[in-house]
Amino acid sequence: MVQLSKRLKALREQVDRQTIYAPQKALELLKQTANAKFDETAETHIRLGINPKYADQQVRSTVVLPRGTGKAIRIAVLAKGEKVREAEKAGADIAGSEELIERIQGGFMEFDLMIATPDIMPQVARLGKLLGPRGLMPSPKGGTVTMDLVGAIREFKAGKLEFRADRTGIVHIPFGKVSFTPEALMDNLKSVQDAIDRAKPSGAKGRYWRTFHIKSTMGPSIEIDINALRDLKLEGAA
């Protein structure tokens, strides 16, 4: 049986696991229970009523966090010819063609996101076993297979994230840092909810939203009232 540390026990006592919290209260608790010695990431863990083994029930899309992620993201780009130089000028941390593919095959993985142009995807397919398990394989649905490298790099650097449901139908999306203001966290959280709603697959049956939890990296899980979050209208929202 796993023994909880005194610290985690004390944090868990601040959260009633039987209570589904209003969004504002949940964020208040998130900040209260984040007391590690580093700026913890604010995380969402969302269980959906889908069965990802069926193609028409898979969830994979992107979300733009309007207040950013709070993290510097390292972007690698695979392209050909002038597109490599275009990516470098646009702010890619590393860009290349066949030589970069060979480096990755040799173990180079110092990047958080991979973007590729469509014409090099047949070669990128060789990296499937390396990139796939890490969630780094470029995909059109995720906005990471594109000829618009400048736009894609700018968006992902600014706070765009790719997400997908895992094999159990759970989506895990970071939505900032606990040092963010409550207003910034709420803006990002609302964007996550909107993105999940837009990504609802055609084959989803019954109740789409099952549970919606947030937590800090080292903190306890806090369940949010998803209906209250969906009904929430933020200032400046259309």
UniProtKB/Swiss-Prot annotation:
GO terms for biological process: regulation of translation; translation. It holds the Pfam family Ribosomal_L1. GO terms for molecular function: rRNA binding; structural constituent of ribosome; tRNA binding. It comes from the Bacteria. The keyword Repeat does not apply. GO terms for cellular component: large ribosomal subunit. The keyword tRNA-binding applies. Keywords: Repressor, Ribonucleoprotein, Ribosomal protein, RNA-binding, rRNA-binding, Translation regulation, tRNA-binding. NCBIfam families: rplA_bact. Part of the 50S ribosomal subunit. Belongs to the universal ribosomal protein uL1 family. Binds directly to 23S rRNA. The L1 stalk is quite mobile in the ribosome, and is involved in E site tRNA release. Protein L1 is also a translational repressor protein, it controls the translation of the L11 operon by binding to its mRNA. This is Large ribosomal subunit protein uL1. It comes from Gloeobacter violaceus (strain ATCC 29082 / PCC 7421). The lineage of its organism: Bacteria, Bacillati, Cyanobacteriota, Cyanophyceae, Gloeobacterales. The gene is rplA.
